[in-house]
Amino acid sequence: ILSQHDCECVTCSRSGNCSLQTVANDLNIIDIPFKMEIERQPWNKEFPLIRDSSKCIKCMRCVQVCEKVQGLGVWDVEGTGSRTTINVAGHRTIEEADCALCGQCITHCPVGALRVRDDTEDIWDAIADPDKIVVAQVAPAVRTAWGEEFGLSDDEATVGKILDALKRMGVDYAFDTTFSADLTIMEEG
């Protein structure tokens, strides 16, 4: 499996939380004595879901969760034997596949072959641009869970703190999503 896997673990989004990395470390595999045969398939880097075929270990978890849990069938197996690959079903592009962008395939991928597009640099560029007004919206899930990452109790991890942090980073306006939900309720009466 390692001979067909891009082992650039340091820069991988799953580094430290990768099943293959864990197994390789547990078995004390440091060097790969086999010739690397990494196949890279083209992918639209503008799409919110990023697929890196060079990391795919063909475990089929994405295929199963998309079909059985979401009922969408975006992913499918192509080829047989050593030529087996996981790709968008029906020889379509991901844009044509009716992907709901639910993130289930990303969550179930054990090796980082599927991930969310990282727009961090774009955000920093927008904040640095004096001609742009940057607005941030904090979703309820983030509002309730962000303190966990920093070891803060629920009393310490307030909405005000995260909104203040966004303002200090340079965001012009920061809103809690519940604000817009309240406006909608008031509008619709």
Per-region residue spans from a language model:
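Active-site-facing alpha/beta catalytic cores
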Residues: 55-58, 101, 185-188
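Terminal amphipathic helices with adjacent charged low-complexity linkers/tails
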Residues: 16, 79-86, 95-103, 114-128
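Iron-sulfur-associated redox domains of electron-transfer enzymes in respiratory
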Residues: 115-189
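Alpha-helix capping and helix-loop boundary segments enriched in small/acidic/polar residues
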Residues: 53-54, 89-100, 111-114, 150-157
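Ferredoxin-type iron-sulfur electron-transfer modules and their immediate structural context
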Residues: 1-95
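Generic beta-strand/beta-sheet core signal
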Residues: 59, 69, 77-80, 89, ...
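Short coil/turn connectors at secondary-structure junctions
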Residues: 61, 71-72, 104, 110-111, ...
